[in-house]
A protein has these predicted regions:
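Conserved nucleotidyltransferase catalytic core and NTase-mimicking acidic/glycine-rich helix/loop elements
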Residues: 67-195
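Conserved NTP/Mg2+-binding pocket subregion across the NTase superfamily
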Residues: 2-110
């Protein structure tokens, strides 16, 4: 009760062992965040459409004034083309091709033997990588859980060797240089984005 690590929420387990998150959000802030993404097409560094996904897939239990239901209906719209383009453009730059891009940061961290930094940068690389894939498929981002299986099962556009490269990445982390795997992943995602 009263957890505020990420958002103000109560986390409970019901008698039938179902876990439930009860989240308390300022509706105006929530709408402004979603509007910035969906209407203004402002990309994030990974997870761009998570809150939009959260809104349109939420099971509304209590909505005394109907505002959440109205907001949900307002944003049940087709995926904006400009948003798709902006997410892909922004996150591709983060993957590779710039001095601070993740591929360079990962390589530097590996070279200095900084495993904590490797772990952190790979997580950020994957956040941008999956953001691109969901945007390419015009799917709202479902959040951090089961991303690989959701992509494998539901995405029509995937990089070649999608599962193979992810499995290689995780199998090789902290045991060998993963820069080659990261490079292969970048090549394949650039191939399908044609950028």
């Amino acid at each position: 009760i009263g957890n505020s690590f990420w958002e103000l929420e109560d986390d409970v387990t019901l008698k039938d062992s179902i876990d439930m998150d009860i989240i308390y959000r300022n509706m105006q802030d929530f709408e402004d965040m979603i509007s910035s993404v969906v209407i203004d097409c402002v990309p994030w560094n990974g997870y761009t459409t998570c809150m939009w996904h959260n809104l349109i897939t939420a099971k509304i239990v209590i909505d005394k004034n109907g505002k959440l239901s109205a907001l949900q209906e307002k944003y049940r719209i087709p995926y904006p083309k400009k948003l798709k383009e902006n997410i892909i453009s922004n996150n591709l730059k983060l993957l590779s091709g710039m001095l601070p891009s993740f591929d360079m940061q990962i390589k530097k961290a590996e070279n200095r033997g900084d495993l904590v930094s490797v772990n952190h940068r790979v997580a950020e690389f994957l956040a941008s990588y999956f953001d691109i894939i969901f945007a390419l498929n015009e799917m709202t981002h479902p959040g951090e859980k089961r991303m690989q299986s959701i992509c494998s099962e539901e995405c029509k556009i995937l990089p070649n060797r999608f599962d193979e490269n992810l499995n290689r990445l995780f199998a090789g982390m902290f045991r060998e240089s993963i820069s080659d795997v990261i490079n292969d992943m970048i090549i394949e995602i650039k191939t399908i984005t044609k950028m």
